[in-house]
Amino acid sequence: HTDSERALSRIGIEMHGGTDLDVMVGGLGLGYTAKAALDTGQVQSLEVVEILPQVIAWLQDGLVPLSEELNKDDRFAAGEGDAYQRLAGPPATRHDLILIDIDHSPDDRLGTVDASFYSEAGLRSAHQHLQEGGVLGVWSYEESDSLTAAMNQVFDEVQVEPVRHENELIDQVQTDWLYFGKRRSINS
């Protein structure tokens, strides 16, 4: 839901607390996570890593709801790639904030995606891609005790945030879950 996609950025940036942030977003979706991060005024650069070339083409062709606003922002870049694969390898660069909104949940993954990202080992690898004081945020439509446990093994500070929203199509209140892990700052 777009409320929770925006909250993924907002809460992650609040948890970080810094400015001039370098942000990586795994998965473009409809662009709400990226746009919300840019709208805070605390982001210096934001890169979306999107595995589907069609989605990048839709963005470039103006078919994604926020295409025009994202494409005209000089801080924004989007490229084709596998965010999970990038985070599994050695870091070429370190980010202040990494926001992942790719799968429906750790247990309901899209396609044949390897689940290792959600494991302690996968999160340790992702942790290496964060600057000191950096934050990893993960979106899920369902609560995941196993993700919370793995994050508690890897990160110095973990925060789990439920985001409730009205689903008017089925006339129900639903809850999305946001998971945040913060890497210790040298000064803390």
Where are these regions (language model features)?
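Core SAM-dependent methyltransferase catalytic element
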Residues: Q153-S188
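The AdoMet/dcAdoMet-binding core of the Class I SAM-like
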Residues: T2-E132, V138-W139, S144, A149, ...
